[in-house]
Amino acid sequence: MITPQGMERLKEEHDHLWRVERPETTNKVSWAASLGDRSENADYHYNKKRLREIDRRLRHLRKCIDDFKIIDYHPHMDGKVSFGAWVEIENMEKALKKRLRIVGYEELIGNRDHISMDSPMAQALLDKTVGDEVMVKTPAAQFKWRINKIEYQK
C-alpha cells in the first residue's frame, strides 16, 4: 500500500534515475573504458558499480510502482484513523504532542514525521477516533496517547 503522494515520489525518483543518472553514469563508464587498461582504472570500476546500483534501484522502483496499491482518501475514512492519515496525538503524562502520518515502508525514507503502518504506534492508532486514548507498547516502555486530530490529504 502507498499514498498517492508516495507513488508520485517513487515515479519521480524512477524518472530521474532513468533519464538523468543512468545516462550520465553510462557516459562515465564509456569514457573510463576508452582510457585503456581497465584493471587499475578506479573511475571505470566505481562507475560500473554505480551503474549496477542504479539498475538495482530502478528494478526495485518498477516493481513497487507496478505492485503497490494506491490508497487514496475517501469520505468514509473521515473521523477514523486509517492508512495515510495525519494524526495529532498527545502524551498527557509528558505534555508531549506529535503529528504523524501512517504510511507504508517505502514512504518512510527521509520523512521523520511518517511512521510505518506496521509499527506499534500505528497499530494502536488504526480505526480509532478523536478523543480515544491508546496504549502503545514498545520494547522499552508503555505509553498512553490521546488522539487530538485526524486529517487526510485530499
Where are the regions that the model predicts?
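N-terminal cationic and glycine-rich segments that engage phosphates or anionic surfaces
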Residues: M1-R56
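Short amphipathic alpha-helical segments, especially helix-boundary/capping motifs
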Residues: I2-M7, L61-K63, E107
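Generic detector of short, locally flexible boundary/turn motifs and exposed helical patches
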Residues: R9-K11, L17, R50-R56, I65-D67, ...
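Conserved, well-folded catalytic cores of nucleic-acid-processing
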Residues: L17-V20, A32, L61-I71, A124, ...
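Internal alpha/beta loop-helix hairpins
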Residues: A42-P75, G79
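Non-DNA-binding regulatory cores of transcription-related proteins
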Residues: I71-E151
